[in-house]
C-alpha cells in the first residue's frame, strides 16, 4: 500500500537531527526512511541485520527508501554437482 499523501514522507528523527559538520558519517537502522535531497552526494550506513552497509546517495535514489539498496538476505550460490564416471 502507498502511504497517505496528507501524512507526508517518513524520515527517521535520528536522520532529521543529524549534524554532518561534527560527524560526517551517517549511521542508521531505519531502512524505511525516504531519501531526501539533503543527503545528496553523501554516504549513509544502513544496518542490514548483521553489519552496516554504505549507501552512496545520488539523484536517481531521491524519493526512494534506504532499505531498497541494502540486502538483508544472503544470495544463495549453488555448486555444480560432480558426476561420477562409471568404469
Curated annotation (Swiss-Prot):
The keyword rRNA-binding does not apply. Keywords: Mitochondrion, Ribonucleoprotein, Ribosomal protein. Its main location: mitochondrion. The keyword Ribonucleoprotein applies. Gene3D superfamilies: 30s Ribosomal Protein S19, Chain A. Disulfide bonds: none annotated. It is found in: Mitochondrion. One of its GO terms (molecular function) is structural constituent of ribosome. PROSITE patterns: RIBOSOMAL_S19. One of its GO terms (cellular component) is ribosome. GO terms for biological process: translation. Pfam families: Ribosomal_S19. Belongs to the universal ribosomal protein uS19 family. This is Small ribosomal subunit protein uS19m.
Amino acid at each position: 500500500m502507498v502511504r497517505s499523501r496528507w501524512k507526508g514522507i517518513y524520515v527517521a528523527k535520528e536522520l532529521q537531527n543529524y549534524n554532518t559538520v561534527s560527524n560526517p558519517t551517517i549511521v542508521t537502522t531505519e531502512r524505511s526512511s525516504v531519501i531526501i535531497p539533503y543527503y545528496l552526494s553523501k554516504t549513509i550506513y544502513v544496518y542490514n541485520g548483521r553489519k552496516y552497509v554504505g549507501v552512496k546517495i545520488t539523484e536517481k535514489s531521491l524519493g526512494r527508501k534506504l532499505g531498497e539498496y541494502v540486502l538483508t538476505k544472503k544470495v544463495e550460490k549453488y555448486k555444480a554437482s560432480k558426476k561420477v564416471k562409471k568404469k
